[in-house]
């Protein structure tokens, strides 16, 4: 198996046959020099919780783009994000940012998520059909993030386009020269945008997310300006296409299992379980990477120091050793803990908000558009992102009669 398999068109359309092969081959499969991959749930879970597995972000940039690239403002910004750093810096920074994503803070966003869903549906409800990605799934999470930051909603489209360009930094394959230029330009634009906003919040603080960052303290230390800019951009990246793609993935999964869709529509109180099961069945985030900071032995297998391990979350979520009938969508499933948000110290900080957004988006869609039906279920246009699975378009008939 090779790393390039992750960019194969067949994999991008349906990664799960390759995942089945991966789990069956060996505990770990070599995919290159000092690089391993595993899709077994037990190994993924164990390594995510292992404190000797960490991040080597700048080293990975040098490996993919050369030594001088590590000094580029774009990559330096990513090196300040708490998703790319290790303790103790990670512990301090995550503790500060976490104050904005407690259970209480996340739950307080539910009315906003519901209102945003209704407002978007108002714009297209009377149409016979619509591209749900463009008209609902993409603007939905970005508008919520903008409102959380007290950013002009009119800027949401521009911010979303910039974030999509920057997010390619997180793909395992190097960007092309043109993509790198576009990503760098997009970062500079976002950095300037949020620098102005941060300075405004310093003199006129509010109850928004950026003001919370400025007020947040842990052991008397506040975030620096560069840390705030980097991590505000990180929150845009983490909370945008991961959620927007998952809305589409969930609708596709449910429509491919009509009995589950009918069950959910008959009892929308099942929505939290349905969202969790859709995340397990076909999550938008398919893998994460960790580096061995020391020699590690796990389940009798040695992972040498310096080895980069691709932890295939999508494969772990379909592991029959963890889930009964894993290739079946079952919205009443109570067995097993999904790996879609990772685990350990780098567990997704915004997972509660993501779950709330997905629950509100799907519930509101089914309440307002009970006859919604996907128009081209067998001819979907999957994106070309190995680690951000989703469709580019999703045409739906809004008032289809069965």
From Swiss-Prot:
Keywords: Heme, Iron, Metal-binding, Monooxygenase, Oxidoreductase. This is Putative cytochrome P450 133B1. One of its GO terms (molecular function) is monooxygenase activity. InterPro entries: Cyt_P450 (IPR001128), Cyt_P450_B (IPR002397), Cyt_P450_CS (IPR017972), Cyt_P450_sf (IPR036396). It holds the Pfam family p450. Its cofactor is heme. Heme binds at residue 348. Belongs to the cytochrome P450 family. SUPFAM superfamilies: Cytochrome P450. It comes from the Bacteria. The keyword Heme applies. Its EC number is 1.14.-.-.
């Amino acid at each position: 198996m090779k790393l390039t398999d992750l960019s194969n068109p067949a994999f991008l359309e349906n990664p799960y046959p390759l995942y089945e092969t991966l789990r069956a081959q060996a505990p770990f499969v070599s995919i290159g020099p000092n690089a391993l991959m595993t899709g077994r749930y037990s190994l993924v879970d164990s390594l995510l919780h292992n404190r000797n597995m960490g991040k080597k972000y700048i080293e990975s940039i040098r490996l993919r783009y050369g030594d001088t690239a590590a000094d580029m403002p774009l990559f330096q910004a990513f090196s300040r994000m708490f998703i790319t750093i290790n303790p103790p810096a990670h512990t301090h920074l995550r503790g500060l940012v976490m104050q904005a994503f407690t259970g209480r803070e996340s739950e307080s966003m539910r009315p906003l998520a519901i209102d945003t869903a209704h407002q978007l549906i108002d714009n297209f409800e009377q149409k016979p059909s619509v591209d749900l990605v463009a008209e609902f799934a993409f603007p939905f999470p970005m508008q919520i993030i903008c409102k959380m930051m007290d950013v002009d909603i009119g800027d949401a489209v521009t911010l979303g386009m910039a974030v999509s360009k920057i997010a390619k930094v997180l793909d395992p394959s190097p960007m092309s020269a043109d993509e790198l230029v576009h990503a760098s330009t997009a970062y500079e634009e976002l950095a300037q945008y949020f620098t102005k906003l941060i300075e405004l919040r310093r003199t006129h603080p509010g109850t928004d997310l950026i003001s919370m960052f400025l007020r947040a303290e842990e052991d008397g230390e506040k975030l620096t300006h560069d840390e705030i800019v980097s991590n505000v951009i990180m929150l845009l990246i983490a909370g945008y296409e991961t959620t927007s793609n998952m809305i589409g993935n969930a609708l596709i999964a449910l429509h491919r299992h009509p009995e589950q869709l009918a069950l959910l529509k008959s009892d929308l109180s099942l929505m939290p379980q349905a969202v969790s099961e859709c995340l397990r069945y076909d999550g938008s985030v398919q893998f994460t990477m960790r580096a061995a900071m020391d020699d590690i032995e796990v389940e009798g297998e040695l992972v040498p120091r310096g080895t980069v391990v691709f932890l295939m979350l999508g494969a772990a979520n379909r592991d029959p050793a963890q889930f009964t009938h894993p290739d079946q969508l079952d919205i009443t499933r109570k067995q097993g803990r999904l790996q879609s948000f990772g685990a350990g110290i780098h567990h997704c900080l915004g997972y509660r908000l993501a779950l709330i957004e997905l629950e509100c988006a799907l519930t509101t869609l089914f309440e307002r558009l009970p006859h919604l039906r996907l128009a081209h279920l067998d001819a979907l246009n999957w994106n070309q992102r190995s680690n951000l699975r989703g469709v580019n378009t999703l045409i739906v008939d809004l008032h289809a009669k069965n």
